[in-house]
Amino acid sequence: MKLQDLTAFLDSAIPLSFQESYDNSGLQVGLPDKEINSALICLDVTDEVLDEAGYAGCNIIISHHPLIFHGIKRLSGRTITERLLLKAIKQDVAIYSAHTNLDVAGSGVSRKMAEKLKLQNVKTLSPLKGRLNKLITYVPEDHLDKVREAIFNAGAGIIGNYDYCSFTTSGTGSFRGGEGTNPFVGEKGKMHFEKEARLETVLFSHLKDKVIKALLEAHPYEEVAYDIYPLDNDNIDIGMGCTGDLPEPVAEKDFLKVAGTIFSARGIRYSKLTGKKITKVALCGGAGGALISDALASGADAYITADVRYHSFFEGGNKMIIIDIGHYESEKFSSEILYDLIIKKFPTFALRFSEVNTNPINYL
């Protein structure tokens, strides 16, 4: 398989447009036409992980955290990032990363945490905004099914767990073809009225070019009338963090022990106990201090995240316990997400989980 076959799939399944502005997800190292035969999946790219890829014969590493975050002006081995890049190039190992775009995915990092905790009624904590477009076009009624199918196949029409979503009304379109035209219906130079369907649907903004291309190819008219504009709707299935309900209420100290066991946390930092049993839990894999107010607003009794600052631990007050299980611990299951995603699409492609613990933090 070519590297570009795998990266094209990942770029589509976990859209790069969903990543934060500071992020650098996607292909980090490697030529797109390179042949790949096996992948090593990890959280971080380190010396030990590169060695492991060499021993295992893997010629691509798929990580959650990008090796390259900021612009690099030289490759002299001066920094750890430069040294790792040189080592990867020397070993002819490609590197691909899925970071904050995987964090916000509908089946992303926080959702995996919820799955491990067996939460029910899982919902997005902080939905992404401004990532939806509305498409309206006008189609001759006898070509409606063809056009609708084409834009659906291109990715339009998805709302939550529903696909093929659209709305259609009937009306009459008018036009007159000028010089050099070859109208599909009517005659050049004469006003024509045609029974048409107004077709409306929604799409993710990153699919706009693909959907419009499909529309233009399937539509019978020379000049296709369509409107496309951004929506202010929240995308309730995509965003940072999530909330969910425990199968039954649990005492706070018991819940701390459960969280520590599930996420293999060697040390847990947590705020003042509230004295309440925990029913609703909010989660955010990685550094989630910025979502404490969202977790409170959701009515959560506990919020599990990582990298919480000292003063932020006060924000839960007597309403919510804030639990910091560690960055590595909160995102360790990202490898499972990537594995499941890839193996479903490429069932014969060799995938391997890294056995290296890349957590840079040690505890006494």
Question: What function would you assign to each model-found segment?
Answer:
Residues 1-364:
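Hydrophobic structural segments
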